[in-house]
Amino acid sequence: MVGELRYREFRVPLGPGLHAYPDELIRQRVGHNGHPEYQIRWLILRRGDDGDRDSTVDCKAEHILLWMSDDEIYANCHKMLGENGQVIAPSRESTEAGALDKSVLGEMETDVKSLIQRALRQLEECVGTVPPAPLLHTVHVLSAYASIEPLTGIFKDRRVVNLLMHMLSSPDYQIRWSAGRMIQALSSHDAGTRTQILLSLSQQEAIEKHLDFDSRCALLALFAQATLTEHPMSFEGVQLPQVPGRLLFSLVKRYLHVTFLLDRLNGDAGDQGAQNNFIPEELNVGRGRLELEFSMAMGTLISELVQAMRWDGASSRPESSSSSTFQPRPAQFRPYTQRFRRSRRFRPRASFASFNTYALYVRDTLRPGMRVRMLENYEEIAAGDEGQFRQSNDGVPPAQVLWDSTGHTYWVHWHMLEILGFEEDIEDVIDIEELQELGANGALSIVPPSQRWKPITQLFAEPYVVPEEEDREESENLTQAEWWELLFFIRQLSEAERLHIVDLLQDHLEEERVLDYDMLPELTVPVDLAQDLLLSLPQQLEDSALRDLFSCSVYRKYGPEVLVGHLSYPFVPGAQPNLFGANEESEAKDPPLQSASPALQRLVESLGPEGEVLVELEQALGSEAPQETEVKSCLLQLQEQPQPFLALMRSLDTSASNKTLHLTVLRILMQLVNFPEALLLPWHEAMDACVTCLRSPNTDREVLQELIFFLHRLTTTSRDYAVILNQLGARDAISKVLEKHRGKLELAQELRDMVSKCEKHAHLYRKLTTNILGGCIQMVLGQIEDHRRTHRPIQIPFFDVFLRYLCQGSSEEMKKNRYWEKVEVSSNPQRASRLTDRNPKTYWESSGRAGSHFITLHMRPGVIIRQLTLLVAGEDSSYMPAWVVVCGGNSIKSVNKELNTVNVMPSASRVTLLENLTRFWPIIQIRIKRCQQGGINTRIRGLEVLGPKPTFWPVFREQLCRHTRLFYMVRAQAWSQDIAEDRRSLLHLSSRLNGALRHEQNFAERFLPDMEAAQALSKTCWEALVSPLVQNITSPDEDSTSSLGWLLDQYLGCREAAYNPQSRAAAFSSRVRRLTHLLVHVEPREAAPPVVAIPRSKGRNRIHDWSYLITRGLPSSIMKNLTRCWRSVVEEQMNKFLTASWKDDDFVPRYCERYYVLQKSSSELFGPRAAFLLAMRNGCADAVLRLPFLRAAHVSEQFARHIDQRIQGSRMGGARGMEMLAQLQRCLESVLIFSPLEIATTFEHYYQHYMADRLLSVGSSWLEGAVLEQIGPCFPSRLPQQMLQSLNVSEELQRQFHVYQLQQLDQELLKLEDTEKKIQVAHEDSGREDKSKKEEAIGEAAAVAMAEEEDQGKKEEGEEEGEGEDEEEERYYKGTMPEVCVLVVTPRFWPVASVCQMLNPATCLPAYLRGTINHYTNFYSKSQSRSSLEKEPQRRLQWTWQGRAEVQFGGQILHVSTVQMWLLLHLNNQKEVSVESLQAISELPPDVLHRAIGPLTSSRGPLDLQEQKNVPGGVLKIRDDSEEPRPRRGNVWLIPPQTYLQAEAEEGRNMEKRRNLLNCLVVRILKAHGDEGLHVDRLVYLVLEAWEKGPCPARGLVSSLGRGATCRSSDVLSCILHLLVKGTLRRHDDRPQVLYYAVPVTVMEPHMESLNPGSAGPNPPLTFHTLQIRSRGVPYASCTDNHTFSTFR
């Protein structure tokens, strides 16, 4: 099963060194399906943790709360089950129950009630005075009672809440401190009580007005203590914003409200119905109302959290002038803020006829330094992104641009770019066509975060995870989630406006019942009505709610289309076509205000029209008597649009030369602090500018003094800003300022003391921010889990926005030198800066001895390296590093931890040294130990350090993957349990998996913003759900059969019946195919590493892929399990077939058909995947391996025979020949399984024999080479290939022999010419006679030469002579000699018959053939003497009876063998001849001679065999034509048919004996070497040496082996493979080439002797040859009417 079972509990692996363990049952509830569900706390344990179930677990430990069903509890949490198998319910008994007597407890409750009344009375009496001592004593006694847990119930009275509220709002510090003591005592019992107390206090009306800084901090500290143990989460490496206390308190209120509602939803029915005095009555409602209230509260919390985290400001563009919870929709649609920059000097793409023409224009016009804009989406770059053109070359893509959106260069195509020109040429214009084009390409994104959201359309592969069909009726209405998101804004309207919405819904929906406000959540609202509501809502909502509306998903889906063209909303494109004219008219009527300060006026002008409020504020504050009404009006505008105010404060971060601007701004801010309404402005968002101004060494003293006055005034007014200054490090900055100016700055010391006192509060604020954010993330993960479990939609407003912000930055990469503090080098430090200048043409070059060069990085605190890359260049030759070692240490003196060792290839340019470190190393040292080609010094082109992403994505990804992995592994375990109990439930697995994967697909498309986030979820789902299920269903059970194997076996069994679509077998097969398709094809689109995964770019841009791994395709474990299961099924199927049918005559065709069926089934089940086809072949091979040796030899002989028959049958041509070729092809595909098996040697033996007979009897053809090319791996010794190669060598010898004959002829002709001259001078008459004789000799020699010349053009044996060739031959010779072609073969490659079949040319061939043979023998001897080495033994020819001939008999051409040719030519001189005399002359074995006589005496043959009493064997004579008419002309094939061997005969047993003897030798040699083992090559050599010379089998065994006594290295390797499979030999994975002896073999080892005891050395090698004879004329034939035989070929 998946995971690990310890202490009978299931442990789920969550990551490297992490696993989850079920610890405790927290609560139970009734699920949506009516079945009970149980919340289990899973502890996250690291490697080495004990995890003992009896040990107590600290609740601060990292854990995950997971709701589980009965089946999941039964499969994963055995400890939670009772003896009867039922889940043990959680205990509700108090730990101190029974400790107090009921009477004593009643008396204490009475005392508490009286103490509460007394404290309230005393508190009212001392209002405005110093609290009396009795009041403090009363509160102290109440705190003591509150610490007793059994009395917790009495403190849930509402009067206690009122008492605490009065005490917290008291101006006296002691009373507030006592209230804190009582709250701590009440909340010390359990988290539920603590949460209820905090909730009840925070929900009081206007509590913020009654609480001062200390009281608020007391409640915040209590909340921090309450949430610290609930959601332990670390945000190390992520820069959290500074959140003021008032905003934190508001977040705490929202968070407490949400957690309370969530706790009520997760409670059982009894808890939901119980009344609680601590909480308001409006929250004690039913479940349906609770779900609505929870969704609305969660949406409000997300809205405020996004604003507090300043995610909207970080994601908005700099020119955006709005500050909202989310990036505002108006800021994107206002024409004056969303202008497109372009230059009118360059032509747009729309003015060209084609992309190619435009690409040429851009290529010729564009110059380095010009600005460009992207026109379409391309990999990482989106349409609308701008950048600076750098360079171009001939690569693909050709243009390199530095993009503003990514911060690095990226290569794109010419036609994708629009030229903007140099900066001075660019104008802010709007082009309608361009706007439409960019809108179509996605440049005008309407998603609130500027991070481009690219929905994942294929998280899993189609078409197997098919999305659900969209219901047309549902598409016409809003979903409940969309309606509730719209309802979120309706709830923010006034009472009258809500009633108007209800009336509108009543009119449109035509409901029979009368609607009221409480019935709105249950309505089904049409899309048209929702669009009308979206049209009216912007006019009624406040500014903050309006910006939230523009950011929600329902507005993005339905709002923009309906609002286009309506004048009621000016922010929609096209809504106000005369908007520019209206603005111009208003500007003409009301000229802009001018500031008295020129510096401030420049700031106002840079802000545009929105900056005019700053001028109004300056004028209102600058008058002698500040105009309070005008100032408040300006403050109200700045609260709605705070960008001008933030720009005013951030101007302090400008250059110190702007002294006038700084003083003006500080005086405005100083006056602004005096107004209470000004404290509502977001001062905290720009406080960093003040700290930067403090830290700047160039800041003027006057500016510093004014800044300190302002900060002192601000922190005195609200101590929250002192806390923020502490968080920003202002204390150290003020100390440095005091030290520089020697303490002459007024109020600086006081400001520093005030900031220092807030250290504890700063820590509290940071902890609260972390806890709230971590708690929200946990609640979001809980909602995702509930969404997975129930498949109910997530109905929380802004849920998608929150996830997008959490995932924002997952596709961003940062390569900046801010990850290290400094870089040190071993030599030439003046060039160290070249390592970080990002210029590949510069380099740092070392100077020193080899191996002493290093680069040291001093890392910034907390930076964990994600990737460290070294840039090198191959052109540096010997200066290029070859061996690099990376070490880490805590100090420069202790860099001794080796982190990685890298060998650098000479062709490398980027060398990854480190990836995904898990801890922080202060010092990283790169040591260059060796250079290429033995170089001394080294050159490094650059360093790139990729640190942790400064976003929340790594944290959220880790939590999302952990929860997802735990959920799906628990579910996979439960499903596996069902399958183990009933295999038939495996048929339902495809629908289960399909539903789960479709759910994740839909979730990713709606909520996950980019590819990496979707891939992280996809990879986790795959590893947690599919991988364990595949492992379980492919693991064999008690009967050694896996569940999937049983299912596949059933599929193969009913395959034929499944062709009927109406049968049950068809439905069954369909389910099996759907399951296998899903398991194989549903895979992650990108293989992602465990820590980070970035999509790999293509082509030129691949250099920016920092952390790409592997990886597409199925995980190796899944593929291995599936292929192993399929292999075992195929093996079992084929083993049954082989066992039952190996003796059948039609075994091979049936085997090929079975193989084809399995191959087709593999494609049906798993698609065209090579891994499963290979598994199918390996399964067939495993089945063959299980056969005994003789049966396997029989199988191999049958295949060799079948191939031989199909090759010979294909020669007949026509339809029958094509059918033979098709059968041959199917057989060749099936026989390929022999290639890795021991049986391949046996198959090669038989194939070699049949191929030799085929080549020598009918000749070679193109099919021989094609067959060998396809099944070549099945021949370990490559003997068939060598046989074909020897034919080519023989043809070359034949051509050389032809040249040799011509040379001999030329010499003879010269001699004849000299003789002729001498005879003519001496005797004229006798000279004439000599001349005729010489001409006769010349003609005879020339005939032989031409015959051989004619053979030079022949490439294949058995090819008929062409007409053109005949004409060429007749031109010189008139056919006086038959053509003789000699085929020289070697016994090393060709199977040669015994010596008794050797041909004696002197006695068996006619004289006219013997001459050619003698000439060839002389030629071969001379060629061998010239080409051979001195020490090499001389080769000699031995003529055999093998071969073929063409004999002319009257008008017929008889195709016969060499033996038949000799027999027919023998009858030219005799009318009849006895078989006995023929055998005596030829010395042929009787069976060979009778095999040759059979076809000659058949009905097609020319001979008759007559039996005579006195002549054994009969008499042969030429058949009389009158007795039996025969065809007079044409070709007649009389070559004896092929004879096949029997594997069960003596030869097969000899092969088995040889294998056993080789096994003995292998085992004996390995035994002698013991545990040291032996290299496989050395073992083969020793075995061959022992076979030739050493101790070998007894003489009887050797003689019984016959021709099988020869041994080759392939035979030895085959035996080694056999012994490895049987387990007799073993080898280690790290050294697979070394073999060891494992166990004794079962083969008895015989006594060994020499195979050739009397030989002093090896015999000289023999070379066998055969004949090919051809002739045109028959001058020696009889001229009578009797038919005679003449050798034609």
UniProtKB/Swiss-Prot annotation:
Gene knockout outcome: Mice are neonatal lethal and show vascular defects in both the embryo and the placenta.
Every DOC domain range: 793-972
Biased composition (Basic and acidic residues): 1321-1337
Annotated Gene3D superfamilies: 2.30.30.30, Cullin Repeats (1.20.1310.10), Cullin, Chain C, Domain 2 (3.30.230.130), Galactose-binding domain-like (2.60.120.260), Winged helix-like DNA-binding domain superfamily/Winged helix DNA-binding domain (1.10.10.10)
Covalent link (Glycyl lysine isopeptide (Lys-Gly) (interchain with G-Cter in NEDD8)) residue numbers: 1567
Pfam families per UniProt: ANAPC10, ARM_CUL7_CUL9, Cul7, CUL7_CUL9_N, Cullin
Bias (Acidic residues): 1358-1370
UniProt-annotated location(s): Cytoplasm; Cytoplasm, Cytoskeleton, Microtubule organizing center, Centrosome; Cytoplasm, Perinuclear region; Golgi apparatus
GO cellular component terms, semicolon-separated: 3M complex; centrosome; Cul7-RING ubiquitin ligase complex; cytoplasm; Golgi apparatus; perinuclear region of cytoplasm
Stretches for region Disordered: 1321-1371
Subcellular location, principal: cytoplasm
PANTHER family recorded: CULLIN AND GALACTOSE-BINDING DOMAIN-CONTAINING (PTHR22771), CULLIN-7 (PTHR22771:SF3)
UniProt family annotation: Belongs to the cullin family.
Subunit record text: Component of the 3M complex, composed of core components CUL7, CCDC8 and OBSL1. Component of the Cul7-RING(FBXW8) complex consisting of CUL7, RBX1, SKP1 and FBXW8. Within the Cul7-RING(FBXW8) complex interacts with FBXW8 and RBX1, but not with SKP1. Interacts with CUL1 (via the C-terminal domain); the interaction seems to be mediated by FBXW8; it is likely specific to FBXW8, but not other F-box proteins.
Domain notes: The CPH domain is essential for interaction with p53/TP53.
Described purpose of this protein according to its UniProt entry: Core component of the 3M and Cul7-RING(FBXW8) complexes, which mediate the ubiquitination and subsequent proteasomal degradation of target proteins. Core component of the 3M complex, a complex required to regulate microtubule dynamics and genome integrity. It is unclear how the 3M complex regulates microtubules, it could act by controlling the level of a microtubule stabilizer. The Cul7-RING(FBXW8) complex alone lacks ubiquitination activity and does not promote polyubiquitination and proteasomal degradation of p53/TP53.
Protein name per the record: Cullin-7
Species of the source: Mus musculus (Mouse)
Lineage: Eukaryota, Metazoa, Chordata, Craniata, Vertebrata
